[in-house]
Structures are given as structure tokens and as C-alpha cells.
Amino acid sequence: MNLKDKSLFLGLGCCGGKQAKKLIEDYGYKGIAVNGSEQDLKALGNINKYHLSGFDGFGGHREKSIDCLSENEDFLDYVEHINEKIIFVLFGGGGSTGSGCATILTEMLSQNLDKKRIVCPVITLPSADEAIIKHSNAYQAVQELQEIDGLGATFFINNDIDKDYEYINSTFAKFIDTFLSNDAYT
């Protein structure tokens, strides 16, 4: 059994959902896309999804994530019962749904010592030409991630590499699949 079979991708917000879709559809990984926007979830097609009811995006306000998660207890229960050993938390650092929920969920997943999981945040950084609030959200998310003990590898995806975000997501998916599907690591 390779690491692929032990992994799950939790895609938060619009960016994380698109990344999770790529890994689920193109490489056969287990995963789920999570968002408050039904429109964003619908655009992802036929993959596992969870709608954060009552929150159609946070409008740039990461602090709404605490209220959102507390009002979606069934989603927190789902997260608590994830059995895979390696969990990748995918999100756009500049967004508010992903960057706000990701740090809370990453900490929650990594603190459950009974499950002995490896939790790996994957933060996509905003492009240099994006609004200052996007950079502020990403900065706050990175600061919060640094304070979480026991994290696995943290991946940073640089959106300044290319304006073709599909290409960036495809490249990351290919590289992570090459690593996780290699039988030499088991």
C-alpha cells in the first residue's frame, strides 16, 4: 500500500475546492470540497462536497469562520471522524472562507493525538497584483499555521509563477501524486 491510499484532500473555499477536484478526478484521491457558496460547489461537478449552510462566502472577513464552523456542527463531526492518516488541507490564503476555516480545521485535525494523523496545509498565496486584503488574509493564515504544533509539511503555492491557475494546480497535483503514489515510501 502506498501513501496515496492513506491520504485525503480537504479543499476549502473556491481555490481549495478546485485543487481538490483536480486530485480527486484526475488522480483518484479521496477528498471533499467545502464552501459556503452553492454556486462555487456546483461548478465543481460530481465530487464529494459539503455546503457550509448560512455562509455564502465571508466577504474577505476571515473572522467569520468561527461562527461558520460552530453553526455547521455536522461538518465538524465529519472532520473529527476522518480516518485517513495523511490529510492535506487545501485553501487560498487570500480568500476568507478557506484561509479562515483552514487554520481552525488544521489545528483541530492535528490535535487529535488518538488518530496519529499527519496534517499538511497547502496554502495558495495571492498574486502580487491582488488586493491588499488578500495579502493580509494570507499573512494572518501563515502566522496562525506557524503557531500550530505537530504539523506535517506545509506547502506554499505561488500564484505569481503563471496567470494560468489551472496550470499551477495541475502542476502541484502531478508533483504531489508522484510522491504519494511511489511505493518506495511504504
Please report, for each region that a protein language model flagged, where it lies by residue.
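Tubulin/FtsZ superfamily GTPase core signature
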Residues: 1-186
